[in-house]
Design a protein with these regions (language model features):
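Catalytic core of pol beta-like nucleotidyltransferases
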Residues: 1-25, 33-39, 48-142
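Short, well-ordered beta-strand segments
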Residues: 44-46
């Protein structure tokens, strides 16, 4: 699907999701939110609810909406998104629905705050992963 079509579809799906009064936030992220993308294979939407949606509820919503659109739809619960993914959504995703409007600001601030707290650990993980990769490339030491 063309990226522009996917973005338009995401807006339509956000409106449909917004018919549920529990839905407070809907973001499109991934390739469909990338202004440089020409094609997308799936549509990534992050959804925030009060109370948050169960895995079963999200799977049912994704199946229902995906069956009517013909594209694979991934729904990610914002409340349970890993720190790095939440940061990616906050920084590079597009908010399609925020109810109330300050819900978007609240999510972005929480996601960035959690990421900055986690960033030193993430950098250490990358250093350790790099050291392990270098050791594998060198092979066994005699």
């Amino acid at each position: 699907m063309k990226a522009a079509e996917a973005r338009a579809l995401a807006r339509t799906l956000a409106e449909e999701l917004g018919a549920n009064p529990r839905v407070q936030l809907v973001y499109v992220f991934g390739s469909a939110a990338d202004p440089d993308a020409a094609e997308v294979r799936d549509l990534d939407l992050a959804i925030g609810g009060a109370p948050s949606f169960s895995r079963e509820e999200l799977l049912a919503m994704a199946a229902r909406l995906g069956s009517t659109t013909g594209i694979t739809l991934d729904l990610v619960p914002l409340e349970r998104a890993p720190v790095v993914l939440a940061h990616e959504i906050a920084n590079h995703g597009t908010c399609l629905l925020a109810r109330p409007p300050e819900a978007e600001t609240s999510f972005v601030l929480r996601a960035r705050d959690a990421y900055w707290d986690f960033k030193p650990l993430l950098e250490q993980q990358w250093r350790l992963a790099g050291a392990r990769q270098e050791a594998r490339l060198r092979g066994p030491q005699a």
